[in-house]
Amino acid sequence: MAFFRIRILLIFICVAQFAIAQNRGKINWTADGNAYTKVKDGNIIQVDPVTEEETIVVSKTKIIDPAANKALLPQSYEFNSNYTRVLIFTNTVKVWRYNTMGDYWLYDILADKLTRLGKGLAPQSLMFAKFSPDGKSIGYVSEHNIFAEDISSGEITKLTKDGTRKLINGTFDWAYEEEFGCRDGFRWSPDGNMIAFWQVDATKIRDYYMLNTTDSNYSKIIPVEYPKVGEDPSAVKIGVVNVNTKRIKWMNIEGGPQQNYLPRMEWSGKNELVVQQLNRKQQESKLLYCNTNDGSTTTFWAESSSAWVDLNADDPSGWNWINNGKEFIWISEKDGWRHIYKISRDGQTEVKLTTGPYDIDDIKCIDEANNLIYFTASPYNATQLYLYKLNIEKPSLLNKIFNGKNITKEEFDPVYANGRDGTHGYQISPNGKFAYHTYSSHNTPPVKEWLRLPQNTPLNEAKSIEATARTDSTVDVEFVKIKTADSITLNAWINRPKNFDSTKKYPVVFYVYGEPAASTVRDAYGAQNNFLYKGDIRADGYIQVTIDNRGSPVLKSAAWRKSIYRKIGDVNISDMAKGFTKLLEMKPYMDKERTAVWGWSGGGSSTLHLLFRYPDLFQTGIAIAAVANQLFYDNIYQERYMGLPQENREDFVNGSPVTYAKNLKGNLLYIHGTGDDNVHFSNAELLVNELIKYNKQFQYMAYPNRSHSISEGPGTFEHLSTLYTNYLRLHCPPGAK
């Protein structure tokens, strides 16, 4: 997933409408890239993107659960290499964020045989099942151990035997999943004889105990292995188990396992792994080769930063090898911008394929047959996103794909008379011949088309974006650049109310996030909507604004993004306050006497900061699931951006909103779910105690047993939306004056 996109989505429900509009589920391309498969009406079908012809590959009548006497409902599926068998994942349950546990079934298309995997194992306990490359076995995880099941005989081999809740084989603990995107924790060897896997030793990690008080007469303790900032992380190591002998060889990776992270690992040869290692502060990244025969390791490439090193990709699987494994493609910010590099296998030679003062967003496809790399970027407007291509062997001939016109690197221009400014998304076939293209802008609802590459021409002109795009004339959004008092230029948007009259004054609702995990200023349809408001916020006469502060993950240089290092709660809050102050000066129709700020998660923290520290700027704040004290959050995230509290504890204290709670002057509504495994409910209790200490009156809502998204249970969203709307309307009255 894109560097830029994932950080937008990490605001999760705060941009739910935008996410749904912009993102189709991941396309399941066939191996040759000339078609794709999907689930439709319970059947697994194959679709030809050129003719749009649909062919049923697996009929729902063939996948009947004999015990329930009804068809399986595939959550996901995977074919073997020759498309004669398919793994079906169903009856799933959530593990923290995602439904990664459930039942797996194997359907043999030629034999017309359906088999449930994991006989004798607990129902709904299998995770990450996948075919071995030779197609003879299926590997999966159950109850923290790794298994291999022979397809022909059905024999199940338990490859690890020491797995417990605290000693995890083949998957990850809470922190690795949340902060590194690591879930699937094992990889088949190319010959199918071995499995490389992560083992996470969380035995020394203290549990955070959540309390379920709603599901029975007696409360139930829910332990979460959660290493808080300043605490050592889980000890992680990589092993290789022989499927036939069950012998395990552990990789001898230098550095203490609790002072380094191993977030990426893949096979790089028959008896070799490639691994990415980050040190505890995440300021040093090393790429290693591990010999799976003797466990020895060799470092072949490294980079460092005085702030932090981002992971190469948000998707933890795969490695971009080219030239028969002699080189690989890598993304790095080592020159101050996010660029694409070609690196030799031994790490001794590197070629920077993209150059100049701009960031690339994400690699969309490596079409090695045509020496092309397709990637997204936006050199001239950080609120937008476009597709580019480059020739791997001739990177100076960098062309932008835009409305079928190739524009050379020397002709980069932010203005296209016949183009469509906004946010473009692409899913490109493995062979580089087809692309599923989505587009929207602030005033263009989402549209989609299928393209033929490299020509960049629609497969169906009648269904092309040019034929179907329309302008929403009801939208009144203005993108502005704000130059603050300390000469920092910030991007912002203003969403004006319906029937706007510039001679009148309107209340202002400031939506904030502010931390390195997400940005909010996007030229995309729906990104300006307030999903939590019950009713039509524009019809009710509110102006809505948002600002991307320094430190937000936008395409404006590594220096921009990393200026927040050790300064969360400082740089970002200052930028927001100064930017908002400047907006009030620039736009006289904004009513300074009716200003409200709100946000969720990191945005909740920013809301508290602004309300506590700038009491004359904001009259009202609504903070949801905020980190009140940075020392309460997990170590991977907080240490990446703030360092170690053992070395600079004052930065954590000064950056925590609870430090300033005594300054509350305006109206505060604070909301939190008691079952929040991410930002723990103890943040709410700490904040409440501090406000009580100083006799600060406020409104408070705790949602019993709800998680960070406050979405579980009947009526929850309706109640939350009503609460939010009523409070806003009461303390920041709507309408023009």
Q: Where are the predicted features?
A:
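Alpha-helical hydrophobic/aromatic positions enriched in membrane-embedded helices and signal peptides
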Residues: 9, 124, 181, 223-224, ...
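A periodicity- and composition-biased signal for non-globular, repetitive helical segments
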Residues: 11-13, 155, 556, 640
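Beta-propeller folds
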Residues: 21-421, 430-434, 444, 474, ...
